[in-house]
Amino acid sequence: MAQEADGIRLDQRHGKARVRVGRVWRHAHDGSHHFVEWNVSISLLSHCLSSYRLDDNSDIVATDTIKNTVYVKAKECGDRLSVEEFAILIGKHFCSFYPQVFTAIVNIIEKPWERVSIDGKPHLHGFKLGSENHTTEARVEKSGALNLTSGIGGLALLKTTQSGFERFVRDKYTILPETRERMLATEVNASWRYSYESVASIPTKGLYFSEKFMDVKKVLMDTFFGPPETGVYSPSVQRTLYLMGSAVLKRFADVSSIHLKMPNIHFLPVNLSTKENPSMVKFKDDVYLPTDEPHGSIEATLSRITSKL
């Protein structure tokens, strides 16, 4: 919300970024522990125009206070909760506790700590770090209105066949050959928006969003790879991206849109030759040079079209 004074319109926010917190929940019934590591960033939109115009900080919530609040709220959460639930909880607190705060935007990145298994048995308190992150952004209004997104960051996927690229624009700058056989590799960054429009409307089932995160991830991966025996052919990253996004929208009624960013990470064919040995290495879809730059950049947003009737 813009504020005006002295012929100037001011849009402002302040907060605390990269507040790192680890939380352990100990379960007495079986002796197991659950661990999460969160990187929390908070922005507050508030009525504090006087701090910009005058020597008056009376409406500013100190960023150190914002940081401390994250740890206090983490301590108060006696039961395990999802990263989305924690983001909403933090947002609700700032909007209700401080009269001058009308919007809280909470971004959290959850590191992928996974329980280890020893001799096939889940360890009660042992964890290893995985690859892709679980992300969320909750925008909470004082009125209770909510804009909630979840996401996956750094989901590296690769298939060694069932991919090609043909019939693209060819001109005097084009040297790329057409192919129906290539390796397809990408690092998926996805974010999807939920259709819940208020804090009161979110599901009450515990860890609902953690389960939904795993379900969305599975749909994305299943669509990318196809059946385990045969796979599925990809004529382009664009087509595969579209199929992945539309599969999520078809499967999950409470997801209103999804944004996918899928760089085309290249594995270049290796051919080596000399005068003495013209076939030192002759590429037969077997030896590649991995490279991650430059890479193709493909991204799109798919949104559900709702009837206006």
From Swiss-Prot:
Cited Gene3D superfamilies: Urate Oxidase
Main EC class the enzyme belongs to = oxidoreductase
| Protein's pathway | Purine metabolism; urate degradation; (S)-allantoin from urate: step 1/3
Record has GTP-binding as a keyword = no
**Where this protein primarily resides, as one coarse class?**
other
Active-site residue numbers: K16, T63, H266
Alphabetically, the GO molecular function entries are: urate oxidase activity
Q: Which EC number(s) does UniProt give?
A: 1.7.3.3
N-acetylalanine PTM positions read A2
Placement of sequence motif Microbody targeting signal: 307-309
Q: Which residues bind urate?
A: T63, D64, F165, R182, V237, Q238, N264
Q: Which reaction does it catalyse?
A: urate + O2 + H2O = 5-hydroxyisourate + H2O2
Where in the cell is the protein located? Peroxisome
| Listed GO CC annotations | cytosol; peroxisome
InterPro entries annotated for this entry? Uricase, Uricase_CS
**What's a GO biological-process term for it?**
purine nucleobase metabolic process
Q: Name one Pfam family in it.
A: Uricase
Q: Which PROSITE patterns match?
A: URICASE
Q: Keyword set for this entry? A: Acetylation, Oxidoreductase, Peroxisome, Purine metabolism
Give the protein's biological function.
Catalyzes the oxidation of uric acid to 5-hydroxyisourate, which is further processed to form (S)-allantoin.
Family of the protein in this entry: Belongs to the uricase family.
Query: What name goes with this protein?
Result: Uricase
Source organism (scientific name): Arabidopsis thaliana
